[in-house]
Amino acid sequence: MMQARYSVADPNALGVVPYLSEQNYYRAAGTYGSMATPMSVYPAHEQYTPGMARSYGPYHHHQPAAPKDLVKPPYSYIALITMAIQNAPDKKITLNGIYQFIMDRFPFYRENKQGWQNSIRHNLSLNECFVKVPRDDKKPGKGSYWTLDPDSYNMFENGSFLRRRRRFKKKDVSREKEDRILKDQGKVQGPIPSLELPKHDKKIVIKSESPELPVITKVENLSPDGGSAMQDSPRSVASTPSVSTENSIPDQHPASNGFSVENIMTLRTSPHGDLSPVPAVPCRTGMVPSLPINYTQTQSSVYSQACTQSMDTSGSYQCSMRAMSLYTGDRPSHMCAPSTLEEATSDHHNGTASPLNSMSLGSGQESVLTSSHHQQTATGGQTAAPWYLNPGADISHLSGHNFGSQQQTFPNVREMFNSHRLGIESSALSEHQVSGNTSCQIPYRSAPSIYRHSSPYAYDCTKY
């Protein structure tokens, strides 16, 4: 059997050992003659052929077995023990059964039994994947049975005993079981809290944030025939003052498109002297955030249409705390608005009242706007210029009023709103007191000719 493995194609080659070939080869004299020249030392070499064949016959069979079967198998002791246990009929085997299985399967372990059997015992006791099962039957024999832990069957990769994943430990198995249970529970119950609820929360947050902008624009878009929106504006805006002061600024242009054209068309039809102030800021109701809201967005929508008519100079519009409005052009005189709607209508010329007078106001509400703003005539298609970059006109000659820097940025406006809010909460001002802490100043680009007043509109500020 082993000679067939080592048969060679050319037995006459010099490097081939003769006894590795078939034995009948030595009886053939013709084939041996080719080796006569190198082996001329032996005159009668044919007489050695039968003797060589017989004398070395037993040795020939054992010699090729040494390099093949005496090589150590590439399996670990754990793999050898696992093979023995899995080949047992009951998946359990004694220590002697493990020894016998290894020696029958691998001839390498037929020698040096003391060394590798000691290693087998160490691996059985040190590895948790092998479980010792005591004998419970009355069968003859000694020694306990060894079996595999049920969780260690996947210890080797793809069933190959050459590669083991990692050292088996019961702690790792218990952790893996807990992880599997948690994962299984997470698959059943996990999608509801982990996936759907955050989406639902996100939807709720978006719905709670997005209506703020439409609510602000809806409150601030004052139509000439909608008085209820004016009454609701301080309450609805007061709930979100911080959002209104910041978010109302970018929305001034969309708001101006829906409101300013209608309002200007109404203002064109009415005479200049008969226009009464628009009720815009209810100051007595205590709704502080209504000041920045009404003057940042709605009033800018009215006046920004006329901003394109200004050439070089510009006016400044100041709303004081006690419902006093100052609109200046190039006149050195002090122009103040009447404090209430009744005074405005009584002090003005008796004529056809503007439709803006029909807006209903709550009790004690004061409005601050003079008719000079409504004398603007501008086309609705013109684009509203942003009022942040407008340099204010020279209005330092006006006494009794404090004016801020002529070029205002939005943080300064916010600081004025905060100081204005603090001024309202700290002390009640008298009617003639107007200071920088209780005023919000917003510059508007406008031509001086638009803000010029005729003599009947000049009111003395000391009157208030």
Curated annotation (Swiss-Prot):
- On whether Nucleus is a keyword of this UniProt record, the answer is yes
- What SMART domains does its record include? FH
- The answer to whether the entry has keyword Plastid is no
**InterPro entries registered for this protein in UniProt:** Fork_head_dom, FOX_domain-containing, FOXC1/C2-like_FH, TF_fork_head_CS_1, TF_fork_head_CS_2, WH-like_DNA-bd_sf, WH_DNA-bd_sf
| Record GO biological process | insulin receptor signaling pathway; lymphangiogenesis; mesoderm development; positive regulation of DNA-templated transcription; positive regulation of transcription by RNA polymerase II; response to hormone
Biased region (Basic and acidic residues) positions are: 171-186
Quote the subcellular location field of this record. Nucleus
- Composition bias (Polar residues) maps to 230-258, 351-366
Question: What is this protein's function?
Answer: Transcriptional activator. May be involved in the dorso-ventral patterning of the mesoderm.
Q: Which GO terms describe its molecular function?
A: chromatin DNA binding; DNA-binding transcription activator activity; DNA-binding transcription factor activity; promoter-specific chromatin binding; sequence-specific DNA binding
Q: Where would one find the signal peptide in this protein?
A: none
Top-level taxon: Eukaryota
**Keyword terms of this UniProt record:** Activator, Developmental protein, DNA-binding, Nucleus, Transcription, Transcription regulation
Task: Tell me any Pfam family this protein matches.
Answer: Forkhead
Which PANTHER family did the record assign? FORKHEAD BOX PROTEIN, FORKHEAD BOX PROTEIN C1
What protein does this entry describe? Answer: Forkhead box protein C2
Q: Choose one Gene Ontology CC annotation of this protein and give it.
A: nucleus
Q: Which positions make up the DNA-binding region?
A: 72-166
Ranges for region Disordered: 168-196, 220-258, 341-366
